Amino acid sequence: MFVSRLAASGLLLLALLAVSLDGKPLQQWSQRWPHLEIPPLVVQNWKSPTQLQARESPAGGTTALREELSLGPEAALDTPPAGPDGGPRGSKAAAAAPQRLSKSKGASATSAASRDLRTDGKQARQNWGRLVSPDHHSAAGGGGGGGGGARRLKGLAKKRAGNGCFGLKLDRIGSMSGLGC
């Protein structure tokens, strides 16, 4: 049944095509397959990326922190150090130590830069310790600033604290608070 419908629709299409042409011969454009003239592919020559200098960032500028750390304490100074006769008094002490740096600009500037690079500070360690430690509770109460009823065990109680069910610590009266051990 399906094949007969397909054959009937094919014959109908051929009949309509013949009627639309009205017996005229095929035109030249319909004798061959119409296609657009596509030019052949052109190979593009790309320039290679330029090499960056050692102190140049990809954005084209210089990184101030990297430059300050690589050049040493002299880079932290706004003005070059005074020469032998460039001191305020022109004394021999200024001539004896021409490379002496002031505390406010030289040593502290480089230590401040290295302090900024440090990732794990004391405060971060304290916060992490509070999150990780299971003994300290966040609720208020208890004495000594340890947080909720945390108390320091001494002597034999300290040794027995780890002898609980599943390696958990026992509470003060020696039970596991409903774990069923």
From Swiss-Prot:
Q: Which Pfam families match?
A: ANP
The residues that cross the membrane are: none
Disulfide pattern = C165-C181
Tissues in which the UniProt entry reports expression: Venom gland.
User: One GO biological process from the UniProt record?
Assistant: cGMP biosynthetic process
Signal peptide location in the record? 1-23
Q: Which residues carry this modification: Pyrrolidone carboxylic acid?
A: Q31, Q44
Q: Where is this region: Disordered?
A: 74-153
Q: What is its main location?
A: secreted
Task: Output the Gene Ontology terms for molecular function.
Answer: hormone activity; peptidase inhibitor activity; toxin activity
Domain of life assignment: Eukaryota
- Compositional bias of type Low complexity: which residue ranges? 104-114
Keywords (alphabetical) are: Cleavage on pair of basic residues, Disulfide bond, Hypotensive agent, Metalloenzyme inhibitor, Metalloprotease inhibitor, Protease inhibitor, Pyrrolidone carboxylic acid, Secreted, Signal, Toxin, Vasoactive, Vasodilator
Determine if Zinc-finger is one of this entry's keywords.
Answer: no
- The biased composition feature labelled Gly residues covers 140-150
A single cellular component GO annotation? extracellular region
Q: Which residues form the propeptide?
A: 24-30, 41-43, 50-78, 90-157
Where it sits in the cell: the answer is:
Secreted
The similarity annotation says: In the N-terminal section; belongs to the bradykinin-potentiating peptide family. In the C-terminal section; belongs to the natriuretic peptide family.
Say what the protein does: Bradykinin-potentiating peptide both inhibits the activity of the angiotensin-converting enzyme (ACE) and enhances the action of bradykinin by inhibiting the peptidases that inactivate it. It acts as an indirect hypotensive agent.
- Write the protein's name: Bradykinin-potentiating and C-type natriuretic peptides
